[in-house]
Every structure is written in C-alpha cells, then in structure tokens.
Amino acid sequence: MPSALTASEIREAFLKFFEERGHRRVASSSLVPANDPTLMFTNAGMVQFKDVFTGRETRDYRRATTSQKCVRAGGKHNDLDNVGFTARHHTFFEMLGNFSFGDYFKADAIAYGWEFVTRTLGLSTDRLAVTVFNGEGGTPWDEEAYELWKKQGVPAERLYKLGLKDNFWAMGDTGPCGPCSEIHYHQGDDIPCVEEAEGKKCQGVACDCDRWLEIWNLVFMQFERKEKDGPLIPLPKPSIDTGAGLERIASVVQGKRSNYETDLFQNILATVSELCGKPYSQESGASQRVVADHSRAAAFLISDGVQPSNEGRGYVLRRIMRRAIRHGTQQLGLEDVFFFKVVDRVIELMGDAYPELRESRTFVLEVCRHEETSFRQTLSRGLKLIEEELSELQKAGGKQLSGDVVFLLHGTYGFPWDLTQIIARERGLDVDLVRFEERLKEEADKNKFAGSGDKATGEVYLKLAERLGTTEFLGYEGEGHEGEGSIRAIVKDGAEVTQATQGDTVELVLDRTPFYGESGGQMGDTGRIVGHGGKAVAKVTDAQRPVPGLVVHSVEVSEGTFKVGDMVQAGVDSERRKSIRANHSATHLLHKALKLVLGEHVKQAGSVVAPDYLRFDFAHFSPATSAQLEQVEDLVNGWIRDNAGAETRVMSLEDAKKSGAVAMFGEKYGETVRVVTVHPESTELCGGTHVRRSGDIGLFKIASESGVASGVRRIVALTGIGALQHVREQEHELRKVAELLKSNPKEVSKRVEATQKRVKELERKVEEVAVKAQTASSKDLLEQARDVNGMKVLATQVDAADDNVLRGMADQLRDRIRSGVVAIGGEKDGRAIILVAATKDVVAKGINAGALVREMAKEVGGKGGGKAEMAQAGGPDASKLPAALEKLYELVKGVGTA
C-alpha cells in the first residue's frame, strides 16, 4: 500500500524510476556550493548542474536524477522564525529531481511525472491538480504543456493557469528560463484557510493555505534572456529541471497533514521527547519540532564542512543550532547538554542514504557538544547583561532598547538578537532593530561573504569561457615546465583588447599552457611568455582560474608586442614549481598523518600551497600537543624516506570515491577526476602538481600550530631547503640565548627556570616596597575619611598604577579603618583602575563592594565586579576618575538610607 512507503523507500523508488528510464543516478552535491559565489547554501537540485544548463560544463550523460541535500536559511530564503510553528517550514530538506540537458523535453517530463505520482506512488488522480503558465508580460501561455497534461488524462477542470509569480522560472536576471508546471495534491477542504477566515474565497491551488499542497515543480527551460529585461530567445536545445520535496511527498503518501508526522521526523521527535520527558503532540510540540528540524540541518551542514562562527555560512549554522538549544533549555527544560544526542539520532537514521554523515560522526557530535557548552555559558552571561541594560532603561523611563546594545550582545557574546527582542517584549519594551541592522551592515561591509570562489568572477571571463572553452593544461606531462600555445585573448583593465605592447600590464589567455592556474589551494605559477622569436617578452607574475577551466596569465610586457593569434612559448619558473610540488605532496601526507594521530574526524578546512611554505587548516577542537606534532612529523618524514613512487590515475568520480580516495571540502569535481597517490598511505582527489617520488620532498618540519576559528586548527609547515633553514635559524637563536645565559644549549631550560624564579622573587620584593611606600602616609589618608551614616568612607586617588599595589593598599587601609569602606583609584596608560574594599561588619549591613564598583565604573566608561568585601573595576576614561571616586560617598549614603 502507498501509505506503507517510508521516506527512504520513496527516495529509492524515485531514483530507481528515473534510472530505469535512462537517467544517471548522481550523488547529492555538498550543501556548500562549489565555485559559486552567488549562493550561501545549495538550495535546489539544479545547483550542481548550473554550469551544465548554461553550457559551460559538459558531462558524459544527458539525463540525471538526484536526491539533493538542501538548506534554506539566510538571505531571501530566511524562514527560520517559522520553523517548528508550521507544518511545512524546514531549514534542511531533500529535493528529489530529474534533469534533461538538451535531451527530452515537455512530453517526456510530463509523462514521467504523471506516471510516477499516479502509478509508482499510487496517488489518486481525483486528488491531483496541475498548473501551467497563463502567459504574461508578452510571453505566450504554455498551451503545449496544457495539451500534454490533458493527454495524460488530467481533466480541464483540474488544469489551472497561473502567472509569472507561480509558473515561470528563471535562473537569474539573465540566462536560461522558462514556464513551469506544478503538481498539487488536495489534502481536504477541512484545512483552515486564511482567505476564508477573512471572509474571502479560498484561491485553491493559488492559495497559501494547505488545502492544495504543491508536491512537484517541473521547469521547462526553453528560453534564454541575454540581458536584464531583454527579449526571450528560444533555446536550440531546451532542458528539463524538476524538483519534488521528499518531506511533502512523504506526508501525502503516508496520509499526514504535517511533514513532522512522517517517519522522517517521528523517530527524531521520539528522541527529543525521551530526553525532555514530555510526550510529543502536534498541538504543543513546537519546541520539539524546532529541535528535530534544526538537528537535521546541523548534522548535514557540519558534515559538509561548515563550522559555527560569527560570519557567513558559519553564522547561519550557529543561529540554527542556538535556536534549537534555546528551545531545549528554556522551553523543554533540558538542563544537561542534549543537542548532540539528537544529532546522533539523525546520523543513525540518515547515514545509509548519506554516508558522509557516518564518516564524520565523531567530529559532528564534538562540534555540537562544544557549541552547546559554549552557548549555555553565553546564555547565562547574556541574560545577566540584558537584565542590567533593561533595568537601567526602565529606571530612566526609556521604552526602546538601543540597537547598539543588541549588536554588542550579538557580536561580543553571540547572543541571538531575536532572543533579546523576546526578553525586551516581556518587559514591555521595544528594540531598535533598525540601528541593529545598520550595525550589522557596517560589519558585513567590512567582511562581505565571498562565497567559495577564490577571486571575483568578472563578466569578461564568463564570456571568454563561453567562447573559448577550457584551457589545455600541459603541466602534467614530463616536467611540464614549457609548452607552445596560441594567444586566444588579451584583457586589459577588465576589457578585451587586440594587442599589448612594452610597458603594458595585461592578462593573456592561451589555448594551451604549462602554467598552473591557482586552485585547490595551490598558488599559480610564474615565469615567462616569449613570442616572435624572442622579440616579444612578458613576465608572468601570476596565473589564475577566474572561471573553472579557464587559465588567465597576469603578465608585464617587457619587450615587443603581443597580438591575439600569436604563437608563443610559455615557460614556468621550474625551481618555484619544484618547491610547490614538494609542498603540495607534503600537504597530502600531512593530512593523512593528522588523521592517524588525531583521529579520522580530521577534515581539511582550507589550504595554501606556496613555494616557500604550506598552510593546512583542519577540523579539530583542541590544540595538538607537542608530542602529537612530533608524531605527525615522524610519520611524514618516514614516508618521505620511503621514497615511494607517486602515482596519478584518471578515473570516474564514482570509481575514485569507491577506491577510498579522499575528496577535498569545497572543491567541485567533474565526472572524470585525477587521483593522486603520493605514498601508499595517502590517496586523494587532486588536480594539482606533485612530486614523482615522496623522497623528492626532502624534509618536513612543522613551523607552527594554532587555532583560527572554533573547531579549526592551522598548521604551517616547511619542506626541503626551507625546512632545513628553519631548523638552522632555531639553532642559531638557541645558541644566542645560551650565550646570554652563560650556559650551553642543553642547559638553557634549567637556566631559564632559575632566572624566572629569581625575577619573581625580585618582583615580589619590589611590590612589597611599593606598598609600604604608598601606605606610609596612610595615617594622613585615614584623616580624609568621611562619616556616612555612621560608617567611615574613604575614596582617594594615588600615584600607583599597578593592580597588585592598589589591592595591597586597599587591604591595608581597610584593616586600619576597622569599620567602613575604602576605594583606591589609580591611572595606567590613560585607563582608570578602581579597587573597593569593605569590612565584614558593613557588609553585614548591606554594603557590597562589587555593586559599588560597578556603579563607579560607569563614570569612567567601564565595567567591574567582584565579591562583597573586595571588588575591582577599570575604564578607558581616567579623566573621570575623581568623579567616580566621589560617587562612592553618594552610593554608600543610598545604601544606608534604603
């Protein structure tokens, strides 16, 4: 029975259906779009085929079917606040799709779609309706699709014509576009409709209510728009792009009114219910739905290499995770760290369909555990700070919390702005979101989301790629340092020109080149291009790939003239290339060694392969110990000494993955890939240049290991001569230190320890002398004490600028005053320092040094705190220190009269 089909069975049935009809089953691409700076996340099945549809990429198949991982959260698809409170909104979902690249068109697409929903899924034709484009804006209505649907047996009364908004699709302002048809399923007229609630008529398939549920969209790419608002030009080979949300289809097949009632979510919701001890219900389970939905998004995003952070994709992930954690802690009462347990259930349930979840399980769970632990601390600090700010605002009679405060909470403490808004509203206060968004924009302008491309893709390069195709790379064969090619294009200041003469700085595009264009972290080559028998010479300063497959040479013409069509000799700086090869191969070995030493969860998070160093970013939470780094070095150097022959094989992407080759995060691979084995221990997909034998690397030395973001570590390392020079420099420094300490290198550490101990002893003695000198006149200071409400209060500024000296003075004056409060102020580098100390008897009467110093700190523009008997504060405005100290008397008086 159709109702018995699970979501997994529906997914497999869809893919198998189209496989049997000549479609290639293609694996889901990453949620991080490769080489597409326009998208934050993959949000549709066609994303991985965008270049195929535009003709920039060709594949060895013309029909494809996929189950694509998608995330819609952030940008124009930001429905995050609705997730959990509606039946359909999700952050993560699966898009089933079938695609034709200039092969079949409307007739087959419509026939396939109708056959699958009515025969394979067994949906009743009486509950199905279809929409077609009605014609608008000068574009004719889709009569062809209308007639084809009728041919399938769809009656005219269930064929609806809708406009551009609903039934016309475009990739952007320019590019492929065309009408579309949507298949809708009737769930029942008893479902509430907003239109009817307002006294209007339900709009049926065009209504936003759920009576008619869209389950499949078939896009007919039959036009192309060359320029914005330009005419639609018929494509010579129209294509098909369809998308069906698995969650929606599962709800229909399983007879559920909500996606959350399907088996995709019920098992996850059961885990949430078990953790919080509250039974799930559709009516009261909003917070449980939030946790269930967000756990799916977190699992898939982290497994695809996204890390929680305060910018770009990482910030969207952080917001998703923290929203789930907040609902778990505040609404569901989950006191212990819980989110990673829900995510683990997601991995268990979906790991068969998406093996990458299981492969990265350890790391995914650690990221979730770490983020929740951190956020729980943030939540506590943030709640305390916002409480202070709101109390101050209400005391002053204010009605709106400043957007600057919201930004401070958001940026400094990672506190969600929407939570700040909720808390403010509970107090009857508004939030200045306009100012908050201004601050966000200012921050975004400083660090704009750059996408996954290394350089901005200029229109000129897109046009060149369309016209010229890919550049043939000669660098893999032989030494790969030299080659002959023809100049296909010359670009100057972003525009094509026909020639370049002496003194010009331009970019050359050749049909064939030995120059490696920067990609995959490997820097571009440098060298020379010579033409006209040596009469024209250009220095190549860089080689880039602004568009996949197109190599652009940045050159400075030093002699003669180069023209489009000239044959030239291109020569790479061979020594520089040799160093890059060594560093690139060493990067592969380093990656493998890190996995062996730190764990299989280690994933590359970025790299730079330069001639003089290599930099490798990887997913790992804690700093690697010295012993671990030594172990990594030993492994890599051992593999280098093995002098194993490096091997490069060309195979299909599918075969490469089956062979166990490691794919790099963020890289886009074609159907045919290069698989590089530097040593039997290391096999990776890679298009870069490498050594012939592992021994060619020479020597490997780690120069540094550090953290660059939460859960991301960075290693900088050197190879060959560079590594040797690094070791020698360290030796020279060690000898210098030994000479200064009048020791030998082996005894340096002992001598340094002894010296440090001596320095600390001297510092202690100096501090004692300073305190004695400052307190020698304490008798005079005590005479300045005032009587406030029967207790002695002293606030004074001294010349001491050391925290410890001020603390010592405060201690001594408190002892001498016997009963009362003392405040000592000092200045250091223009900043104010304030120490407040209170005797035990006045603390018992309600005096609190921490509360006093917090109020005093506001005068100097700072903050402070501490215990009831001793507290400290600091602030940037030392000029207001006298006013801050004077405020103590007023504050104590207020306590005494309270």
UniProtKB/Swiss-Prot annotation:
User: Which Gene Ontology cellular component terms are annotated?
Assistant: cytosol
Database matches in SMART domains: tRNA_SAD
Q: Which CDD domains match?
A: AlaRS_core
In this entry, which stretches build a coiled coil? none
Residue sites binding Zn(2+) per the record: 584, 588, 686, 690
Localization, UniProt? Cytoplasm
Q: What is its EC number?
A: 6.1.1.7
What Gene3D superfamilies does the record point to? 2.40.30.130, 3.10.310.40, 3.30.54.20, 6.10.250.550, Bira Bifunctional Protein, Domain 2, Threonyl-trna Synthetase, Chain A, domain 2
Biological process terms from the Gene Ontology for this record are: alanyl-tRNA aminoacylation; negative regulation of DNA-templated transcription
Q: Which GO terms describe its molecular function?
A: alanine-tRNA ligase activity; aminoacyl-tRNA deacylase activity; ATP binding; tRNA binding; zinc ion binding
| Highest taxon of source | Bacteria
- InterPro entries linked to this entry: aa-tRNA-synth_II/BPL/LPL (IPR045864), Ala-tRNA-lgiase_IIc (IPR002318), Ala-tRNA-ligase_IIc_anticod-bd (IPR018162), Ala-tRNA-synth_IIc_core (IPR018165), Ala-tRNA-synth_IIc_N (IPR018164), Ala-tRNA_ligase (IPR050058), Ala_tRNA_ligase_euk/bac (IPR023033), DHHA1_dom (IPR003156)
Q: Which reaction does it catalyse?
A: tRNA(Ala) + L-alanine + ATP = L-alanyl-tRNA(Ala) + AMP + diphosphate
Role this protein plays: Catalyzes the attachment of alanine to tRNA(Ala) in a two-step reaction: alanine is first activated by ATP to form Ala-AMP and then transferred to the acceptor end of tRNA(Ala). Also edits incorrectly charged Ser-tRNA(Ala) and Gly-tRNA(Ala) via its editing domain.
**Free-text note regarding domains:** Consists of three domains; the N-terminal catalytic domain, the editing domain and the C-terminal C-Ala domain. The editing domain removes incorrectly charged amino acids, while the C-Ala domain, along with tRNA(Ala), serves as a bridge to cooperatively bring together the editing and aminoacylation centers thus stimulating deacylation of misacylated tRNAs.
Please give the family membership noted in the entry. Belongs to the class-II aminoacyl-tRNA synthetase family.
Q: PANTHER family in the record, alphabetically?
A: ALANINE--TRNA LIGASE, CYTOPLASMIC (PTHR11777:SF9), ALANYL-TRNA SYNTHETASE (PTHR11777)
What is the protein's given name? Alanine--tRNA ligase
* Naturally occurring in which organism (per UniProt): Myxococcus xanthus (strain DK1622)
Top-down, what is the taxonomic lineage of the species of origin?
Bacteria, Pseudomonadati, Myxococcota, Myxococcia, Myxococcales
